[in-house]
Regions:
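Terminal transmembrane helical anchor/hairpin motif
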Residues: 92-102, 183-205, 246-326, 557-560
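Conserved ABC transporter NBD signature motif
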Residues: 385-405, 541
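Q-loop/switch helix immediately C-terminal to the Walker
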Residues: 411, 421-435
Length: 562
Protein backbone atom coordinates (compact mmCIF):
# COMPACT_ATOMS: atom_id res chain seq x y z
CA UNK A 1 0.00 0.00 0.00
CA UNK A 2 2.69 2.45 1.03
CA UNK A 3 4.66 1.69 -2.11
CA UNK A 4 1.70 2.66 -4.29
CA UNK A 5 1.12 5.83 -2.31
CA UNK A 6 4.78 6.81 -2.49
CA UNK A 7 4.73 6.28 -6.23
CA UNK A 8 1.72 8.59 -6.57
CA UNK A 9 3.35 11.27 -4.42
CA UNK A 10 6.58 11.14 -6.41
CA UNK A 11 4.68 11.42 -9.68
CA UNK A 12 2.60 14.30 -8.32
CA UNK A 13 5.67 16.20 -7.14
CA UNK A 14 7.31 15.75 -10.53
CA UNK A 15 4.41 17.18 -12.49
CA UNK A 16 2.99 19.61 -9.89
CA UNK A 17 2.86 23.23 -11.26
CA UNK A 18 4.50 26.03 -9.36
CA UNK A 19 1.27 27.90 -8.70
CA UNK A 20 -1.10 28.75 -5.91
CA UNK A 21 -4.09 26.60 -5.08
CA UNK A 22 -6.45 28.94 -6.96
CA UNK A 23 -4.51 28.32 -10.18
CA UNK A 24 -5.07 24.55 -10.06
CA UNK A 25 -7.60 22.85 -12.29
CA UNK A 26 -10.21 20.55 -10.63
CA UNK A 27 -8.16 17.50 -11.63
CA UNK A 28 -5.00 19.05 -10.23
CA UNK A 29 -6.83 19.97 -7.03
CA UNK A 30 -7.99 16.37 -6.76
CA UNK A 31 -4.41 15.15 -7.25
CA UNK A 32 -3.22 17.57 -4.59
CA UNK A 33 -5.83 16.23 -2.18
CA UNK A 34 -4.72 12.68 -2.94
CA UNK A 35 -1.10 13.66 -2.39
CA UNK A 36 -2.03 15.23 0.95
CA UNK A 37 -3.74 12.05 2.14
CA UNK A 38 -0.87 9.94 0.83
CA UNK A 39 1.73 12.10 2.58
CA UNK A 40 -0.27 11.95 5.78
CA UNK A 41 -0.46 8.17 5.56
CA UNK A 42 3.24 7.86 4.81
CA UNK A 43 4.12 10.14 7.70
CA UNK A 44 1.79 8.37 10.16
CA UNK A 45 3.50 7.10 13.29
CA UNK A 46 0.82 4.53 14.13
CA UNK A 47 -1.20 2.03 12.13
CA UNK A 48 -4.41 3.76 13.26
CA UNK A 49 -3.27 7.12 11.87
CA UNK A 50 -2.12 5.45 8.66
CA UNK A 51 -5.48 3.74 8.34
CA UNK A 52 -7.47 7.00 8.61
CA UNK A 53 -5.48 8.70 5.86
CA UNK A 54 -5.29 5.56 3.70
CA UNK A 55 -9.07 5.10 3.74
CA UNK A 56 -9.57 8.72 2.62
CA UNK A 57 -6.91 8.27 -0.07
CA UNK A 58 -8.52 5.13 -1.55
CA UNK A 59 -12.03 6.61 -1.32
CA UNK A 60 -10.91 9.69 -3.26
CA UNK A 61 -9.10 7.47 -5.77
CA UNK A 62 -12.32 5.51 -6.21
CA UNK A 63 -14.21 8.68 -7.04
CA UNK A 64 -11.58 9.48 -9.63
CA UNK A 65 -11.97 6.06 -11.23
CA UNK A 66 -15.74 6.43 -11.37
CA UNK A 67 -15.56 9.91 -12.91
CA UNK A 68 -12.98 8.78 -15.44
CA UNK A 69 -10.38 11.30 -14.31
CA UNK A 70 -8.15 8.47 -13.12
CA UNK A 71 -7.31 5.36 -15.11
CA UNK A 72 -5.51 2.27 -13.86
CA UNK A 73 -6.07 -0.72 -11.62
CA UNK A 74 -9.42 0.11 -10.08
CA UNK A 75 -9.91 -3.39 -8.66
CA UNK A 76 -6.80 -3.19 -6.49
CA UNK A 77 -7.88 0.25 -5.27
CA UNK A 78 -11.40 -0.95 -4.44
CA UNK A 79 -10.01 -4.00 -2.63
CA UNK A 80 -7.68 -1.77 -0.60
CA UNK A 81 -10.60 0.53 0.27
CA UNK A 82 -12.74 -2.43 1.35
CA UNK A 83 -9.83 -3.70 3.45
CA UNK A 84 -9.36 -0.32 5.18
CA UNK A 85 -13.08 0.04 5.88
CA UNK A 86 -13.26 -3.50 7.27
CA UNK A 87 -10.33 -2.75 9.56
CA UNK A 88 -11.99 0.45 10.75
CA UNK A 89 -15.32 -1.22 11.44
CA UNK A 90 -13.70 -4.11 13.32
CA UNK A 91 -11.45 -1.89 15.39
CA UNK A 92 -8.34 -3.72 14.18
CA UNK A 93 -5.39 -1.47 13.37
CA UNK A 94 -2.51 -3.94 12.88
CA UNK A 95 -1.14 -3.75 9.34
CA UNK A 96 1.80 -6.00 8.36
CA UNK A 97 4.54 -4.10 6.58
CA UNK A 98 6.19 -7.23 5.16
CA UNK A 99 6.13 -11.03 5.34
CA UNK A 100 8.31 -10.83 8.45
CA UNK A 101 5.44 -9.12 10.26
CA UNK A 102 2.85 -11.82 9.55
CA UNK A 103 1.31 -13.52 12.59
CA UNK A 104 0.98 -17.29 12.71
CA UNK A 105 -2.56 -17.27 11.31
CA UNK A 106 -1.42 -15.55 8.12
CA UNK A 107 1.97 -17.24 7.90
CA UNK A 108 0.63 -20.66 6.87
CA UNK A 109 -1.24 -19.40 3.76
CA UNK A 110 1.76 -17.26 2.86
CA UNK A 111 4.21 -20.16 3.24
CA UNK A 112 2.01 -22.57 1.24
CA UNK A 113 1.35 -20.02 -1.52
CA UNK A 114 4.98 -19.10 -2.04
CA UNK A 115 6.04 -22.77 -2.35
CA UNK A 116 5.43 -25.06 -5.36
CA UNK A 117 1.91 -26.48 -5.21
CA UNK A 118 3.12 -30.07 -4.82
CA UNK A 119 5.47 -29.37 -1.91
CA UNK A 120 2.92 -29.67 0.96
CA UNK A 121 1.95 -33.14 -0.26
CA UNK A 122 5.44 -34.63 -0.44
CA UNK A 123 5.22 -35.70 3.25
CA UNK A 124 2.13 -37.79 2.46
CA UNK A 125 3.86 -39.39 -0.54
CA UNK A 126 6.90 -40.23 1.58
CA UNK A 127 4.80 -41.60 4.41
CA UNK A 128 2.82 -43.76 1.98
CA UNK A 129 6.05 -45.34 0.72
CA UNK A 130 7.31 -45.93 4.27
CA UNK A 131 4.05 -47.34 5.64
CA UNK A 132 3.36 -49.54 2.62
CA UNK A 133 6.93 -50.80 2.73
CA UNK A 134 6.55 -51.67 6.41
CA UNK A 135 3.29 -53.56 5.76
CA UNK A 136 4.14 -55.25 2.45
CA UNK A 137 3.48 -59.00 2.15
CA UNK A 138 5.94 -61.01 4.19
CA UNK A 139 6.53 -58.39 6.88
CA UNK A 140 5.51 -58.93 10.47
CA UNK A 141 2.67 -56.40 10.26
CA UNK A 142 1.26 -58.14 7.18
CA UNK A 143 1.25 -61.50 8.98
CA UNK A 144 -0.96 -60.28 11.83
CA UNK A 145 -4.42 -61.89 11.88
CA UNK A 146 -6.38 -58.82 10.79
CA UNK A 147 -9.18 -58.77 8.16
CA UNK A 148 -7.89 -57.35 4.90
CA UNK A 149 -10.22 -54.34 4.72
CA UNK A 150 -9.53 -53.43 8.34
CA UNK A 151 -5.81 -53.65 7.58
CA UNK A 152 -6.37 -51.30 4.64
CA UNK A 153 -8.09 -48.79 6.94
CA UNK A 154 -5.20 -49.05 9.39
CA UNK A 155 -2.68 -48.42 6.61
CA UNK A 156 -4.59 -45.35 5.39
CA UNK A 157 -4.80 -43.97 8.92
CA UNK A 158 -1.08 -44.57 9.49
CA UNK A 159 -0.17 -42.76 6.26
CA UNK A 160 -2.35 -39.77 7.18
CA UNK A 161 -0.89 -39.54 10.69
CA UNK A 162 2.72 -39.92 9.51
CA UNK A 163 2.22 -37.49 6.61
CA UNK A 164 0.58 -34.90 8.84
CA UNK A 165 3.43 -35.20 11.35
CA UNK A 166 6.01 -34.69 8.58
CA UNK A 167 4.11 -31.67 7.21
CA UNK A 168 3.85 -30.08 10.65
CA UNK A 169 7.55 -30.71 11.23
CA UNK A 170 8.34 -28.91 7.97
CA UNK A 171 6.14 -25.93 8.82
CA UNK A 172 7.16 -25.77 12.48
CA UNK A 173 10.30 -23.58 12.23
CA UNK A 174 8.59 -20.77 10.31
CA UNK A 175 5.36 -21.16 12.24
CA UNK A 176 7.10 -20.94 15.61
CA UNK A 177 9.08 -17.93 14.39
CA UNK A 178 5.87 -16.14 13.37
CA UNK A 179 4.09 -17.14 16.58
CA UNK A 180 6.87 -15.98 18.89
CA UNK A 181 7.59 -12.68 17.12
CA UNK A 182 4.15 -11.68 15.85
CA UNK A 183 1.66 -13.70 17.87
CA UNK A 184 -1.15 -15.96 16.74
CA UNK A 185 -3.09 -13.30 14.85
CA UNK A 186 -6.78 -12.39 14.83
CA UNK A 187 -9.31 -14.83 13.41
CA UNK A 188 -11.53 -11.98 12.22
CA UNK A 189 -8.72 -10.09 10.47
CA UNK A 190 -10.27 -8.81 7.21
CA UNK A 191 -9.19 -9.83 3.72
CA UNK A 192 -10.44 -8.21 0.52
CA UNK A 193 -9.66 -9.06 -3.10
CA UNK A 194 -11.15 -9.05 -6.57
CA UNK A 195 -11.68 -12.17 -8.63
CA UNK A 196 -13.47 -12.34 -11.99
CA UNK A 197 -14.63 -8.76 -11.54
CA UNK A 198 -16.25 -9.35 -8.16
CA UNK A 199 -15.08 -7.98 -4.83
CA UNK A 200 -14.70 -10.72 -2.24
CA UNK A 201 -14.28 -10.18 1.48
CA UNK A 202 -13.37 -12.84 4.02
CA UNK A 203 -11.22 -13.24 7.12
CA UNK A 204 -7.83 -14.71 7.97
CA UNK A 205 -9.55 -17.37 10.05
CA UNK A 206 -11.66 -18.50 7.10
CA UNK A 207 -8.66 -18.72 4.78
CA UNK A 208 -6.63 -20.59 7.41
CA UNK A 209 -9.44 -23.09 8.00
CA UNK A 210 -10.09 -23.60 4.30
CA UNK A 211 -6.41 -24.19 3.66
CA UNK A 212 -6.15 -26.76 6.45
CA UNK A 213 -9.17 -28.58 5.02
CA UNK A 214 -7.62 -28.50 1.56
CA UNK A 215 -4.33 -29.92 2.83
CA UNK A 216 -6.13 -32.61 4.81
CA UNK A 217 -8.33 -33.50 1.83
CA UNK A 218 -5.30 -33.77 -0.44
CA UNK A 219 -3.37 -35.81 2.12
CA UNK A 220 -6.33 -38.13 2.65
CA UNK A 221 -6.76 -38.65 -1.08
CA UNK A 222 -3.05 -39.47 -1.46
CA UNK A 223 -3.23 -41.89 1.48
CA UNK A 224 -6.30 -43.72 0.21
CA UNK A 225 -5.11 -43.83 -3.41
CA UNK A 226 -1.68 -45.13 -2.41
CA UNK A 227 -2.98 -47.76 0.00
CA UNK A 228 -5.76 -49.07 -2.25
CA UNK A 229 -3.76 -49.30 -5.46
CA UNK A 230 -0.76 -50.88 -3.76
CA UNK A 231 -3.01 -53.38 -2.01
CA UNK A 232 -4.95 -54.21 -5.16
CA UNK A 233 -1.83 -54.64 -7.31
CA UNK A 234 0.40 -56.08 -4.54
CA UNK A 235 3.06 -53.59 -5.63
CA UNK A 236 4.37 -51.26 -2.93
CA UNK A 237 5.16 -48.39 -5.30
CA UNK A 238 2.08 -48.64 -7.55
CA UNK A 239 -0.08 -46.45 -5.31
CA UNK A 240 2.52 -43.82 -4.36
CA UNK A 241 3.60 -43.39 -7.99
CA UNK A 242 -0.01 -42.88 -9.12
CA UNK A 243 -0.53 -40.38 -6.31
CA UNK A 244 2.67 -38.58 -7.29
CA UNK A 245 1.36 -38.17 -10.84
CA UNK A 246 -1.88 -36.66 -9.51
CA UNK A 247 0.02 -34.30 -7.22
CA UNK A 248 2.33 -33.15 -10.03
CA UNK A 249 -0.43 -32.88 -12.65
CA UNK A 250 -1.50 -29.27 -11.87
CA UNK A 251 2.01 -28.13 -12.83
CA UNK A 252 1.49 -29.26 -16.43
CA UNK A 253 0.04 -26.64 -18.84
CA UNK A 254 -2.45 -29.16 -20.26
CA UNK A 255 -3.95 -29.57 -16.81
CA UNK A 256 -3.78 -25.93 -15.79
CA UNK A 257 -6.72 -24.16 -14.22
CA UNK A 258 -7.82 -22.73 -17.57
CA UNK A 259 -7.70 -26.14 -19.21
CA UNK A 260 -9.70 -27.68 -16.39
CA UNK A 261 -12.33 -25.04 -16.75
CA UNK A 262 -12.93 -25.86 -20.41
CA UNK A 263 -12.60 -29.64 -20.39
CA UNK A 264 -15.41 -31.63 -18.84
CA UNK A 265 -13.32 -34.79 -18.49
CA UNK A 266 -10.34 -33.05 -16.90
CA UNK A 267 -12.71 -31.17 -14.66
CA UNK A 268 -13.80 -34.47 -13.13
CA UNK A 269 -10.28 -35.30 -12.00
CA UNK A 270 -9.42 -34.52 -8.35
CA UNK A 271 -6.62 -32.16 -9.36
CA UNK A 272 -7.70 -28.85 -7.72
CA UNK A 273 -7.22 -30.41 -4.29
CA UNK A 274 -3.50 -30.52 -5.06
CA UNK A 275 -3.50 -26.76 -5.69
CA UNK A 276 -5.11 -25.74 -2.38
CA UNK A 277 -4.39 -22.05 -2.84
CA UNK A 278 -6.36 -22.04 -6.10
CA UNK A 279 -9.38 -23.37 -4.26
CA UNK A 280 -9.13 -21.50 -0.97
CA UNK A 281 -7.75 -18.16 -2.10
CA UNK A 282 -4.67 -16.59 -0.60
CA UNK A 283 -3.51 -13.41 1.04
CA UNK A 284 0.16 -12.57 0.73
CA UNK A 285 2.16 -10.42 3.10
CA UNK A 286 -0.50 -7.80 2.46
CA UNK A 287 -4.20 -8.79 2.57
CA UNK A 288 -5.13 -7.49 -0.88
CA UNK A 289 -2.53 -9.67 -2.59
CA UNK A 290 -4.32 -12.59 -4.13
CA UNK A 291 -3.57 -15.85 -5.85
CA UNK A 292 -6.29 -18.33 -6.80
CA UNK A 293 -10.02 -18.16 -7.21
CA UNK A 294 -11.04 -18.59 -3.60
CA UNK A 295 -14.39 -19.88 -4.80
CA UNK A 296 -13.81 -23.60 -5.24
CA UNK A 297 -13.33 -24.81 -1.69
CA UNK A 298 -16.67 -26.62 -1.40
CA UNK A 299 -16.53 -28.20 -4.85
CA UNK A 300 -12.89 -29.19 -4.35
CA UNK A 301 -13.69 -30.96 -1.10
CA UNK A 302 -16.73 -32.64 -2.65
CA UNK A 303 -14.69 -34.05 -5.55
CA UNK A 304 -11.91 -35.18 -3.21
CA UNK A 305 -14.37 -36.95 -0.91
CA UNK A 306 -16.07 -38.57 -3.90
CA UNK A 307 -12.75 -39.99 -5.05
CA UNK A 308 -11.94 -41.17 -1.53
CA UNK A 309 -15.26 -43.03 -1.52
CA UNK A 310 -14.52 -44.55 -4.94
CA UNK A 311 -11.07 -45.70 -3.86
CA UNK A 312 -12.45 -47.22 -0.66
CA UNK A 313 -15.04 -49.09 -2.74
CA UNK A 314 -12.25 -50.44 -4.93
CA UNK A 315 -10.34 -51.36 -1.78
CA UNK A 316 -13.33 -53.21 -0.36
CA UNK A 317 -13.63 -55.24 -3.57
CA UNK A 318 -9.87 -55.88 -3.75
CA UNK A 319 -9.72 -57.13 -0.16
CA UNK A 320 -12.90 -59.19 -0.31
CA UNK A 321 -12.27 -62.86 0.35
CA UNK A 322 -13.69 -64.84 -2.59
CA UNK A 323 -15.62 -67.99 -1.91
CA UNK A 324 -13.50 -71.08 -2.28
CA UNK A 325 -14.44 -74.63 -1.35
CA UNK A 326 -12.29 -76.14 1.34
CA UNK A 327 -10.41 -79.43 0.99
CA UNK A 328 -12.28 -82.69 0.91
CA UNK A 329 -11.01 -83.69 4.35
CA UNK A 330 -11.86 -81.31 7.17
CA UNK A 331 -10.01 -82.70 10.18
CA UNK A 332 -7.41 -81.09 12.39
CA UNK A 333 -4.17 -80.38 10.61
CA UNK A 334 -2.51 -78.19 8.00
CA UNK A 335 -3.47 -79.61 4.63
CA UNK A 336 -2.43 -78.87 1.06
CA UNK A 337 -4.34 -80.72 -1.68
CA UNK A 338 -3.71 -80.95 -5.44
CA UNK A 339 -1.79 -77.70 -5.48
CA UNK A 340 0.33 -76.00 -8.11
CA UNK A 341 2.79 -73.58 -6.52
CA UNK A 342 4.60 -70.78 -8.31
CA UNK A 343 5.03 -67.08 -8.78
CA UNK A 344 4.16 -64.77 -11.64
CA UNK A 345 3.33 -66.95 -14.63
CA UNK A 346 5.73 -69.72 -13.57
CA UNK A 347 4.65 -72.96 -11.89
CA UNK A 348 7.56 -74.56 -10.04
CA UNK A 349 5.93 -77.25 -7.87
CA UNK A 350 3.04 -79.68 -8.27
CA UNK A 351 1.93 -81.21 -4.98
CA UNK A 352 -0.59 -84.01 -4.60
CA UNK A 353 -0.90 -83.60 -0.85
CA UNK A 354 0.88 -82.41 2.25
CA UNK A 355 -0.58 -82.96 5.69
CA UNK A 356 0.87 -81.75 8.96
CA UNK A 357 -1.02 -83.20 11.89
CA UNK A 358 -1.06 -81.63 15.37
CA UNK A 359 1.90 -82.41 17.60
CA UNK A 360 4.28 -83.35 14.80
CA UNK A 361 7.49 -81.94 13.39
CA UNK A 362 8.39 -82.33 9.73
CA UNK A 363 11.47 -81.33 7.81
CA UNK A 364 11.71 -79.87 4.31
CA UNK A 365 14.93 -80.75 2.54
CA UNK A 366 16.09 -79.61 -0.89
CA UNK A 367 18.98 -77.71 -2.50
CA UNK A 368 18.91 -73.94 -2.84
CA UNK A 369 16.73 -72.74 -5.70
CA UNK A 370 14.44 -75.75 -5.70
CA UNK A 371 11.39 -73.86 -4.40
CA UNK A 372 11.50 -74.44 -0.64
CA UNK A 373 10.85 -70.81 0.30
CA UNK A 374 8.11 -70.48 -2.33
CA UNK A 375 6.40 -73.58 -0.92
CA UNK A 376 6.65 -72.29 2.65
CA UNK A 377 5.23 -68.92 1.58
CA UNK A 378 2.34 -70.75 -0.08
CA UNK A 379 1.68 -72.76 3.09
CA UNK A 380 1.65 -69.60 5.21
CA UNK A 381 -1.34 -68.13 3.36
CA UNK A 382 0.41 -64.76 3.29
CA UNK A 383 1.10 -65.01 -0.43
CA UNK A 384 -2.19 -66.18 -1.99
CA UNK A 385 -0.84 -65.83 -5.52
CA UNK A 386 1.73 -68.54 -4.77
CA UNK A 387 -1.07 -71.12 -4.96
CA UNK A 388 -2.13 -71.28 -8.59
CA UNK A 389 -4.62 -74.13 -8.16
CA UNK A 390 -5.79 -76.50 -5.45
CA UNK A 391 -6.62 -75.77 -1.83
CA UNK A 392 -4.96 -75.01 1.48
CA UNK A 393 -6.64 -75.22 4.87
CA UNK A 394 -5.75 -75.30 8.55
CA UNK A 395 -8.21 -77.15 10.79
CA UNK A 396 -10.72 -76.81 7.96
CA UNK A 397 -10.23 -73.03 7.65
CA UNK A 398 -9.51 -72.08 4.04
CA UNK A 399 -6.50 -69.82 3.53
CA UNK A 400 -8.73 -67.38 1.64
CA UNK A 401 -10.25 -66.51 5.02
CA UNK A 402 -6.99 -64.75 5.69
CA UNK A 403 -7.55 -63.38 9.21
CA UNK A 404 -8.83 -66.69 10.62
CA UNK A 405 -6.11 -68.64 8.80
CA UNK A 406 -3.41 -66.29 10.15
CA UNK A 407 -4.56 -67.07 13.69
CA UNK A 408 -3.58 -70.69 13.06
CA UNK A 409 -0.51 -70.57 10.80
CA UNK A 410 2.64 -68.47 11.23
CA UNK A 411 5.63 -68.30 8.89
CA UNK A 412 9.00 -67.28 10.30
CA UNK A 413 10.78 -66.11 7.16
CA UNK A 414 14.46 -66.52 6.46
CA UNK A 415 16.68 -63.45 6.63
CA UNK A 416 15.42 -60.28 8.33
CA UNK A 417 12.04 -59.86 6.62
CA UNK A 418 10.19 -60.32 9.93
CA UNK A 419 12.24 -57.68 11.75
CA UNK A 420 12.06 -53.88 11.73
CA UNK A 421 15.59 -52.47 12.12
CA UNK A 422 14.70 -49.61 14.46
CA UNK A 423 12.48 -51.64 16.81
CA UNK A 424 13.88 -53.62 19.71
CA UNK A 425 13.44 -57.34 20.24
CA UNK A 426 11.02 -56.77 23.11
CA UNK A 427 8.93 -54.43 20.94
CA UNK A 428 8.65 -57.16 18.31
CA UNK A 429 7.56 -59.67 20.93
CA UNK A 430 5.06 -57.24 22.45
CA UNK A 431 3.57 -56.61 18.99
CA UNK A 432 3.25 -60.35 18.36
CA UNK A 433 1.63 -60.98 21.72
CA UNK A 434 -0.88 -58.18 21.16
CA UNK A 435 -1.64 -58.91 17.49
CA UNK A 436 -2.22 -62.63 18.02
CA UNK A 437 -3.88 -62.09 21.43
CA UNK A 438 -1.42 -64.59 22.85
CA UNK A 439 -1.09 -65.64 26.47
CA UNK A 440 2.58 -66.55 26.05
CA UNK A 441 4.90 -65.82 28.98
CA UNK A 442 7.41 -63.58 27.21
CA UNK A 443 9.85 -63.41 30.12
CA UNK A 444 10.01 -67.17 30.52
CA UNK A 445 10.30 -67.67 26.76
CA UNK A 446 13.18 -65.20 26.46
CA UNK A 447 14.99 -66.79 29.39
CA UNK A 448 14.69 -70.26 27.87
CA UNK A 449 16.15 -69.06 24.57
CA UNK A 450 18.82 -66.96 26.25
CA UNK A 451 17.82 -63.68 24.58
CA UNK A 452 16.89 -61.68 27.69
CA UNK A 453 20.20 -59.72 27.83
CA UNK A 454 19.64 -58.03 24.46
CA UNK A 455 15.88 -57.54 24.39
CA UNK A 456 16.17 -53.74 24.47
CA UNK A 457 18.57 -53.50 21.52
CA UNK A 458 17.30 -52.44 18.07
CA UNK A 459 17.33 -55.54 15.89
CA UNK A 460 19.74 -53.87 13.44
CA UNK A 461 22.39 -54.13 16.16
CA UNK A 462 21.88 -57.86 16.72
CA UNK A 463 24.05 -60.55 15.21
CA UNK A 464 22.61 -63.06 12.75
CA UNK A 465 22.35 -65.68 15.49
CA UNK A 466 20.61 -63.30 17.87
CA UNK A 467 18.11 -62.36 15.16
CA UNK A 468 17.38 -66.04 14.54
CA UNK A 469 16.56 -66.61 18.19
CA UNK A 470 14.40 -63.50 18.37
CA UNK A 471 12.45 -64.69 15.32
CA UNK A 472 11.97 -68.13 16.89
CA UNK A 473 10.73 -66.47 20.07
CA UNK A 474 8.29 -64.41 18.00
CA UNK A 475 6.96 -67.54 16.27
CA UNK A 476 6.47 -69.33 19.59
CA UNK A 477 4.87 -66.23 21.14
CA UNK A 478 2.07 -66.19 18.54
CA UNK A 479 0.58 -69.37 20.07
CA UNK A 480 -0.33 -70.41 16.51
CA UNK A 481 -0.82 -74.20 16.37
CA UNK A 482 1.10 -74.46 13.08
CA UNK A 483 4.58 -72.97 12.79
CA UNK A 484 6.47 -72.83 9.49
CA UNK A 485 10.14 -72.07 10.06
CA UNK A 486 12.41 -71.21 7.14
CA UNK A 487 16.06 -71.91 8.01
CA UNK A 488 15.64 -71.25 11.77
CA UNK A 489 19.04 -72.74 12.68
CA UNK A 490 21.23 -70.80 10.25
CA UNK A 491 23.94 -68.67 11.85
CA UNK A 492 23.71 -70.36 15.27
CA UNK A 493 26.64 -71.85 17.13
CA UNK A 494 26.23 -75.46 18.37
CA UNK A 495 25.05 -74.38 21.80
CA UNK A 496 22.42 -72.02 20.45
CA UNK A 497 21.30 -74.63 17.91
CA UNK A 498 20.66 -77.05 20.75
CA UNK A 499 18.75 -74.37 22.68
CA UNK A 500 16.57 -73.61 19.65
CA UNK A 501 15.97 -77.30 18.91
CA UNK A 502 14.98 -77.90 22.54
CA UNK A 503 12.51 -74.99 22.31
CA UNK A 504 10.95 -76.37 19.12
CA UNK A 505 10.80 -79.88 20.57
CA UNK A 506 9.05 -78.49 23.64
CA UNK A 507 6.41 -76.77 21.48
CA UNK A 508 5.76 -80.01 19.57
CA UNK A 509 5.31 -81.80 22.90
CA UNK A 510 2.64 -79.21 23.75
CA UNK A 511 0.70 -80.23 20.65
CA UNK A 512 1.91 -77.65 18.15
CA UNK A 513 3.02 -78.61 14.64
CA UNK A 514 6.30 -77.43 13.15
CA UNK A 515 7.51 -77.58 9.55
CA UNK A 516 11.22 -76.79 9.34
CA UNK A 517 13.32 -76.01 6.30
CA UNK A 518 17.02 -76.55 6.90
CA UNK A 519 20.28 -77.81 5.41
CA UNK A 520 21.52 -78.91 8.85
CA UNK A 521 20.56 -82.55 8.42
CA UNK A 522 21.89 -83.80 11.77
CA UNK A 523 19.70 -81.39 13.75
CA UNK A 524 16.77 -81.97 11.42
CA UNK A 525 16.94 -85.75 11.78
CA UNK A 526 17.05 -85.46 15.55
CA UNK A 527 14.16 -83.00 15.72
CA UNK A 528 11.56 -84.16 13.18
CA UNK A 529 9.22 -87.12 12.68
CA UNK A 530 9.19 -87.08 8.88
CA UNK A 531 10.78 -85.39 5.89
CA UNK A 532 9.71 -83.92 2.59
CA UNK A 533 12.07 -83.80 -0.37
CA UNK A 534 11.48 -81.72 -3.49
CA UNK A 535 12.24 -83.91 -6.49
CA UNK A 536 11.77 -82.73 -10.08
CA UNK A 537 9.11 -80.20 -9.10
CA UNK A 538 7.13 -82.58 -6.89
CA UNK A 539 6.97 -83.14 -3.14
CA UNK A 540 8.03 -86.57 -1.89
CA UNK A 541 7.55 -87.70 1.72
CA UNK A 542 10.32 -89.76 3.34
CA UNK A 543 10.00 -91.94 6.39
CA UNK A 544 11.76 -91.16 9.66
CA UNK A 545 15.46 -91.97 9.44
CA UNK A 546 18.75 -91.37 11.20
CA UNK A 547 20.96 -88.45 10.28
CA UNK A 548 23.34 -90.77 8.44
CA UNK A 549 20.51 -92.28 6.41
CA UNK A 550 19.07 -88.82 5.74
CA UNK A 551 22.41 -87.59 4.45
CA UNK A 552 22.71 -90.59 2.16
CA UNK A 553 19.18 -90.07 0.85
CA UNK A 554 20.03 -86.43 0.19
CA UNK A 555 23.14 -87.42 -1.78
CA UNK A 556 21.26 -90.11 -3.69
CA UNK A 557 18.47 -87.67 -4.57
CA UNK A 558 20.41 -84.54 -5.42
CA UNK A 559 24.03 -85.56 -6.00
CA UNK A 560 23.58 -88.79 -7.93
CA UNK A 561 24.75 -90.96 -5.03
CA UNK A 562 28.18 -89.36 -4.71
Amino acid sequence: MKQGMQGFVDAFNTRAPQASGTDLSPEQQNDAELARYANAALAAQTDAAFLDSAESYYALMGEGFQSGSIVGDQETNDAALAYCRALSSSGITDIPASANDLPFLSFLPYAIATAPSFLPFIPFLLSSILVLGATRPGTLAAKAPVPKFRRLIQIVFSIIVAGTAMLLAGLAPGGIYALVLNGFGQIGYPIAFFHDGALTTTTAGNVFTALLLALLAGGTLISVCSAVLSTATRRVLAGPLTSALLVAAPAFPLLSDSALGHNAVLGLLPLPVFSPIEATGYVGCFPTEFIGSGSGSASMLAVALAYVAVFFTVGAVATRSPKQPGPAKKHHGLELLDVSVGYGSTTILSIGSLFLSPGTAAGLVAPNGSGKTTLLEALSGQFPTRIRSGSLAADGICQRRSAEFAELVYLSSSGSADLYPTLSAIEHLAFVREAWKSAADIDSLCDSLGISPYLDKPTRKLSTGMKQQVKLAMAIATDCPYLILDEPLNGLDPGKRKTSCDAMRSEVARGRSVLISSHLLDDLADLTNSFYFIEAGTLVEKIKSSSQTLKQEYLDTYEGGE
